[in-house]
Amino acid sequence: YSMQPMQKQTLVPVELARQAVSEVLNDGLSDKYELELSEDNPGKAITITGDQSLLNRMLCNLIRNCIVHNPNGCRIQVSVGSCDRTCTFSVIDNGCGISEPQLNRLNNDKDISSTQKQTGEIEHGLGLKIVRQIVKIHQGTIQFSDTAPHGLSVEVVIPIEIY
């Protein structure tokens, strides 16, 4: 993404998330998955400056990771919120989660190859590398964490204004 110019425009984060959720649903999501969208601050209109197609790609990649890495199904919650001049996109699933070493590698910006281990465990790969690049060019941060009792939470925080 560093090779193509960023197409900056004013965007409504809730609409971005709605488009990504719709795109995944329209691709024919199996009944094993439950996909929900919520607003943390309903009625509070916020906008961000960013590239619509890149941010859509980021959200779709995060949602699809939940699907790919939970072949037996899971509940996926996509939420949008704002706080202190930032917008937060959260993608949370109640699937199998990831190991502590993988979580540490993800939170330390280590690239993880997309491979299936002998145990059958699939590691995250290129999709997250693309997500990281998109977050970076939007001057944001990304954080991975466990959810209780199991699952994964990914939180992307982007400034409401990019300078």
Question: Over which residues does each language-model region extend?
Answer:
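Conserved micro-motifs of the catalytic ATP-binding
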Residues: 1-6, 45-50
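Short conserved segments within the C-terminal catalytic ATPase subdomain
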Residues: 27-39
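Short helix-loop "hinge" at the ATP-lid/N-box region of the Bergerat-fold HATPase_c
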Residues: 65-67
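Short beta-strand/loop element within the Bergerat-fold HATPase_c
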Residues: 75-85
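Acidic ATP/Mg2+-coordinating residue in the GHKL
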Residues: 93
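Short conserved segment of the HATPase_c
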Residues: 98-114
